[in-house]
Amino acid sequence: MSTSTSPAAMLLRRLRRLSWGSTAVQLFILTVVTFGLLAPLACHRLLHSYFYLRHWHLNQMSQEFLQQSLKEGEAALHYFEELPSANGSVPIVWQATPRPWLVITIITVDRQPGFHYVLQVVSQFHRLLQQCGPQCEGHQLFLCNVERSVSHFDAKLLSKYVPVANRYEGTEDDYGDDPSTNSFEKEKQDYVYCLESSLQTYNPDYVLMVEDDAVPEEQIFPVLEHLLRARFSEPHLRDALYLKLYHPERLQHYINPEPMRILEWVGVGMLLGPLLTWIYMRFASRPGFSWPVMLFFSLYSMGLVELVGRHYFLELRRLSPSLYSVVPASQCCTPAMLFPAPAARRTLTYLSQVYCHKGFGKDMALYSLLRAKGERAYVVEPNLVKHIGLFSSLRYNFHPSLL
């Protein structure tokens, strides 16, 4: 008399046969311990990780960030109050060459009082230019004030030290009475004015357009020197419309519609998979090589770097300027944009042909022009500026947060 065996019973018998020393059990335990215990414990405070516990930490971290920004704003204010004035005739660093190689144009409006965003930005640029020394003698700081009100205290203070272009100085502008001109279009027009002023005033080789809440990273000048003098001599980079120096960290994950990210992600698996397989085989005393084990570790490493956060692994590239990557740009955002002079002139023409509105800001306008005009643009990774402005100049935000 034969008896039938249920699938559940067969599965149970197979599981019983598995010993703690079997490869399948060991890899299963590794997966559970890594993704269920170790990674969540290690990464629950990492802002750009999938393991980040938003409800536990976001409010506190946002408040701490704002308090720190206030302190740094006060420090930047004292920094300039203690510097000798240059009466606005030359930059406080030194007199740049008659035709600068790079003009650093900081676009500023009057923002939330107390944070002194633009002072933080300019003071950091000043420190870095001093550290850079003779290598940066062809760099020129330039402030572009697009605030309609005359009460922009920080811009007035900086005019003692840095050359300033004031868009609305001595003009009767009826922008506020024109219902067809919205804040997004005005921001684009301000951008065009500042870019054009930079070209007309200095006729440089490059213009770096920096918004007044984008603080430069320590490595910005060595990296730009390497990129512009070495990497951008390559044919596919030479005629780029612009190079972005910032992309939001929250948008830097691998799971993204950009093909280059997917290729990079697969590359991570192809690199770490064999390495982790070799380590496992060595310490587990397994003979030979196993393709299934390598496939497991490839997927394991790909999942780990994505869930922990690609942003944090990109930071390893800061070890050397040559490790920074240049990849095709996406549409968001414009805190820091580098334009070669010929491309800057093309950009002025392009932007004069588009009208910005809510949902179609200047960043989207610039990105849309790439396909329409057959242009190319790139972004450098990791970021070369830090975005510190939680208070937008376009949108009212009474409860700012880091996400």
Swiss-Prot record:
Annotated effect of mutating residue 317 to A: Strongly reduces GPI-GalNAc transferase activity. Accumulates in the endoplasmic reticulum
Main EC class the enzyme belongs to: transferase
Stretches assigned to the Cytoplasmic side: 1-22, 281-287
Glycosylation sites noted in the Swiss-Prot or TrEMBL record: 87
Lumenal membrane side: 44-259, 309-403
Ribonucleoprotein keyword on record: no
Disulphide bond pairs: 132-136, 144-194, 332-333
Motif (DXD motif): 211-213
Residues that coordinate or bind UDP-N-acetyl-alpha-D-galactosamine: 109, 334-335, 362
Post-translational modification: Glycosylated.
Keyword Ligase: no
Outcome, altering residue 211 to A: Loss of GPI-GalNAc transferase activity
Biological processes per GO annotation: GPI anchor biosynthetic process
Keywords: Disulfide bond, Glycoprotein, Golgi apparatus, Membrane, Transferase, Transmembrane, Transmembrane helix
Segments passing through the bilayer: 23-43, 260-280, 288-308
A GO cellular-component term linked to this record: Golgi membrane
Comment field on protein domains: Contains three transmembrane domains, including a tandem transmembrane domain insertion into its glycosyltransferase-A fold. Transmembrane domain 1 functions as a signal for Golgi targeting.
Classification via PANTHER family: POST-GPI ATTACHMENT TO PROTEINS FACTOR 4, TRANSMEMBRANE PROTEIN 246
Name the record gives this protein: GPI-N-acetylgalactosamine transferase PGAP4
Gene that encodes the chain: PGAP4
